[in-house]
Amino acid sequence: LSDVVLGFDDVAGYESDRNQYFGCTTGRVCNRIAQGRFELEGITYQLYLNNAPNHLHGGNGNSLDKVVWRAQEQAAADGVAVKFSYHSPHGEENYPGNLLIDVVYTLTEKNELRIEYRAVTDRPTPVNLTNHAYFNLAGAGAETVLDHELQLQASRYTPADETLIPTGEIAVVQGTPLDFTKKQVLGTRIGELTESPFLGYDHNFVIDRQGAGVVEAARLRHPGSGRVLTVLT
């Protein structure tokens, strides 16, 4: 057994500059908002530019990854659970509305980890929560993930500008280092991403799907251990 989700051993690590959202709940809005600005019901809101010139993962000092949540043990029919709750007041990080958030982590008897989100607000406001886990299927402490094999059910992606804001175009992955329609080792073509701001993979892929129902969108495998991570949507 190995710990395949990366993080720190103490609170100090999570409070340090080394913490890039390891395992946290991000929000109020995950990912980037261009120029930190949005309009809602005729009102323009200017958010903190913590990833200048954009707003990233909810802002600066009071984004959801930096505040203290209230923890409470909760009954679960199929395992053990803990509920984390937080009240984000109106105007926090310049977002409108009071927002009451519950995030419930359940460890089931089948060794499944289930994360459930619930948010209630008293006025219209954007909310887009996610978990920001980092995975290394070789185990925490392994030096690289570049030996992992990735396959995506995605023949297209959304190109982004130099600040990682999508341009609005939808482009094909064929003939580019972003082509994972067939299984490919992560390190094989990552060096070709010379136009990426981070010289690596940080892209939005457009999933190929037909009809309704749950489908597999991604499969990641570590050859050395045989561990596999699948993403369903």
Question: Where are the regions a protein language model picked out?
Answer:
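An exposed, glycine/acidic-rich loop-and-rim segment of catalytic or binding clefts
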Residues: 1-233
